[in-house]
């Protein structure tokens, strides 16, 4: 859907303001039509700087990728933000945006300062939230000053070595998903739970240029799978789809590279990046996790930090005492990634961890259709709503973007029973830093 009214207004600004900034929401990758167009997708708004002579073309591209333009401003109008917004400069659309693979992350884009990375939030701002009765309150958004970001950049990546590459999908499952562990010895690649790293695959793209990096959610805690501060792990699905014109099977460049990589191979790694999905420091926090497929990666890091014996021993300052609930959507039982780990935690900590599966090709929803994660959320919406109202509760959503609408609908129904408008309440949760989303 094009925003023609916004375009007409932008065209009549003062002479000399010939570069505009689009604020776009909902931008996504469409597997049927846009696999080769390098779309971007990250939670929240995307800000794209567009020359006047490319405005119409860029609008069409945004619409094709499922995006919605919510505002158009001149660059000078945004200078008041003082670096709080990440802006992608559009020259050739495909050259500035990297293809999303794996768990759907997008390459960081250039900011006005020329540095690559994610937008920096203000140090602290007073934000509205709701108490248990739905009343408006305020709280200061949490600071993340000590979070490591961009320790290694694309022009000088860290060279890691593959230690192991293990299959996660059991016999009879669908697709290829691998758990890949890298050796970080000799470097200074520090990270924390909820962040991502970039992988630069070898070779060149269709234009003969070096392949761009792809971002993947980290699947290990800050101490690594061996709890020795020497490794980092990823959970990667091989991207596979049918070309919309030829019908041929096409495989993702970076995901195929990673899922088939041999132990001992060297890999170019950048980052870490990201502050959207960080786990709260409060050991008494409640954590709701809604994940599909490889969206389990950050959830695994949270659960290991909370419950694994070696992790608890390594983190005496963080002994989780809250309540966590994972709702995990997969197509078949063999596709339940890290199944043994998850169920071991559930058995050992039944009062602190609840595990719920939505297995779409094996279970039915109340209407007789497939049981997707949004159906499970609807089934438990009243319980989830009561938990979300607790000011210590953080909610994390990672995986397929399609689940968001159903999740919102379910929670809207639950909130409406108490006279609360979910969309308004959700905005307050986001401002308070208690609603975290990474979908694709």
Curated annotation (Swiss-Prot):
GO CC terms of this entry: phycobilisome; plasma membrane-derived thylakoid membrane
Catalysed reactions listed for this entry: 2 reduced [2Fe-2S]-[ferredoxin] + NADP(+) + H(+) = 2 oxidized [2Fe-2S]-[ferredoxin] + NADPH
SMART domains, per the entry: CpcD
Keyword set, alphabetical order: Antenna complex, FAD, Flavoprotein, Membrane, NADP, Oxidoreductase, Phycobilisome, Thylakoid
First-level EC class: oxidoreductase
Compartments it resides in: Cellular thylakoid membrane
Disordered: annotated span: 98-142
Pfam family, one: CpcD
Biased composition range(s): Basic and acidic residues: 122-133
A single GO molecular function term of this UniProt record: ferredoxin-NADP+ reductase activity
Positions with a binding annotation for NADP(+): 217, 237, 294, 330-331, 360-361, 370-374, 399-400, 438
Annotated positions binding FAD: 214-217, 235-237, 241, 253-255, 294
Location of the FAD-binding FR-type domain: 155-279
Requisite cofactors: FAD
Membrane topology note: Peripheral membrane protein
Residue ranges of domain CpcD-like in the record: 17-75
Location (main, coarse): membrane
Protein family according to the UniProt entry: Belongs to the ferredoxin--NADP reductase type 1 family.
Protein name as it appears in the record: Ferredoxin--NADP reductase
